[in-house]
């Protein structure tokens, strides 16, 4: 996907020492459309998983852009934080955010294994279903 510009007063990436912080990447489909809605109401766990996967692909795009296309500069993924727009009774946030986690591990192998939080929220920017941010360690 194309690296999306921030929608507020912040930067998409920030390198501090050997760490690269990636701002929250929202769920956008392959055609550039926002994946909007609420888990437990408009989306199944499987659809949420796919939305989280798209967030991870956007994280990779931002990382590649920051590193001038050279993902070999990534030593490891430290942490992902996933936010799931969900109903009060929806409790499968971890299953949804597995979409992002599985994608990062698929791309980086063992170096992609990370710590994680999967958080429920009743609203996300622009009405999207999922948002994920990341922290990477660089070589």
Language-model features and meaning:
Residues 1-139:
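Short, polar/acidic, helix-capping and beta-turn segments at strand->helix junctions
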């Amino acid at each position: 996907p194309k690296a999306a510009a921030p929608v507020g007063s912040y930067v998409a990436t920030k390198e501090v020492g050997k760490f690269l912080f990636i701002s929250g990447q929202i769920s956008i489909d392959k055609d550039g459309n926002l994946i909007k809605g609420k888990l437990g109401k408009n989306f199944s766990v499987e659809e949420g998983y796919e939305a989280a996967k798209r967030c991870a692909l956007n994280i990779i795009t931002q990382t590649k852009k920051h590193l001038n296309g050279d993902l070999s500069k990534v030593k490891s993924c430290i942490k992902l934080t996933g936010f799931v727009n969900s109903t009060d009774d929806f409790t499968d946030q971890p299953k949804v955010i597995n979409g992002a986690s599985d994608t990062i591990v698929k791309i980086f192998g063992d170096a992609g294994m990370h710590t994680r939080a999967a958080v429920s929220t009743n609203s996300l920017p622009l009405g999207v279903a999922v948002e994920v941010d990341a922290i990477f360690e660089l070589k």
